[in-house]
């Protein structure tokens, strides 16, 4: 059984349970935002939306 990681949107306070793969991608996107690497952000958002659309809307939209 795959464990889930509770991840919270820092702006809304809403949370989602992510798989380890989704969580790694979420962290990569947030770091790319911080680094102003918008190509990586765009690609990460696209992939995350395909993996978990509900969590995308809660955490990244």
What are these regions (language model features)?
Residues 31-61:
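Short, charge-rich amphipathic interface segments used for partner binding and complex assembly
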Residues 1-34:
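N-terminal acidic leader/helix
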């Amino acid at each position: 059984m795959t464990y889930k990681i509770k991840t919270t949107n820092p702006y809304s306070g809403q949370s989602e349970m992510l798989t380890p793969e989704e969580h790694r991608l979420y962290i990569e996107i947030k770091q790319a935002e911080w680094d102003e690497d918008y190509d990586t952000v765009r690609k990460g958002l696209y992939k995350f939306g395909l993996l978990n659309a509900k969590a995308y809307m809660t955490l990244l939209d």
